[in-house]
Design a protein with these regions (language model features):
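Acidic/histidine-rich, metal-coordinating catalytic segments
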Residues: 119-131, 154-156
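Mobile genetic element proteins and their domesticated derivatives, centered on retroelements
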Residues: 41-43, 83, 89, 109, ...
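Short glycine-/polar-rich loops that comprise or flank the Walker A/P-loop
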Residues: 36-37, 119-120, 172-177
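RNase H-like polynucleotidyl transferase catalytic core
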Residues: 67-72, 143-190, 206-208
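Short catalytic/ligand-binding loop motif for oxyanion handling, primarily in non-cytosolic enzymes
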Residues: 48-50, 130-134, 187-190, 241-244
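Charge-mixed, compositionally biased segments that are often intrinsically disordered regulatory tracts
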Residues: 1-74, 244
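Electropositive, glycine- and tryptophan-enriched low-complexity nucleic-acid-binding patches
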Residues: 60-122
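C-terminal anion-handling pockets and recognition modules
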Residues: 174-180, 184-185, 192-244
Length: 244
């Protein structure tokens, strides 16, 4: 198998520096946690389907493999926004809803901050536009007590463009800040590794009678994962994939 789309940065030196920065933050996460701070790998898993099998799965028997029914009843979809705590391996303050808007993401971050309001927070996120939104800038400015004039979206100041908003959100002097991974580097964000666990352990073989059932089962799995399975991922990136 050969991937057809890989990161081909315009500036390989800058790209390498960004990757190195993320790797260094992962290595620093335990020390940051010891000082009361949080390093979270954050992203959305969209389009999670509430699929109910049209007939019961026939269980494994001597001489016979398990036989699932492949006809489904479709009950809708949900979006999970999750934070993977790099230092502890726990999934923190997940939110699940029908959409992924800038308000949804800002609300998720607000809910996360509320778990430890005075702590330092570093969120590792990708380049999605909702991770550089006006709502997020206003949230961070208020939470950090920043009185600076923010300007106006598409016209002036911090709010003018995605690049100006990203510059503000990634300011290392802020108590709450965001670190952006380069484009086409989902492998660099540890939450993606946890999403694969969610798929294998729950979603792939799941049977969900409604979106409410799906939401409750995901939250129950997260609680179970945090209690029995959570541990930091072993960071091995030297041109190779992540390993658990």
């Amino acid at each position: 198998m050969e991937y057809w789309l890989n990161a081909k940065p315009d500036d390989p030196v800058a790209f390498a520096a960004q990757v190195t920065t993320v790797c260094e933050v992962y290595q620093q996460a335990p020390a940051i946690a010891e000082q009361g701070g949080h390093v979270l790998s954050t992203d959305e898993k969209t389009g999670i389907q509430a699929l109910e099998r049209a007939a019961p799965t026939k269980p494994l028997r001597p001489g016979l493999v398990e036989r699932p029914e492949y006809e489904y009843l479709r009950h809708g979809t949900q979006c999970l926004i999750a934070n993977f705590d790099v230092a502890t391996g726990a999934v923190v303050a997940p939110t699940i809803g029908p959409s992924r808007t800038e308000e949804d993401f800002a609300g998720h971050i607000a809910q996360t901050l509320a778990t430890d309001p005075d702590a330092t927070w570093l969120f590792i996120v990708d380049q999605l536009n909702i991770h550089k939104s006006e709502a997020l800038v206003r949230l961070v400015a208020e939470a950090c007590g920043i009185k600076e004039e923010l300007g106006e979206k598409e016209k002036r100041g911090i709010l003018q463009s995605m690049s100006t908003r990203a510059e503000f959100l990634s300011d290392v002097s802020h108590r709450i800040r965001f670190l952006y991974t380069p484009k086409h580097t989902s492998w660099l964000n540890q939450i993606e590794l946890w999403f694969s666990i969610l798929v294998r352990r729950l979603l792939k073989r799941g049977n969900f009678t409604s979106v409410e059932d799906l939401r409750e089962r995901i939250l129950a799995f997260i609680a179970y994962f945090n209690k029995t399975m959570a541990k930091p991922f072993k960071w091995t990136y030297k041109g190779r994939p992540l390993t658990v």
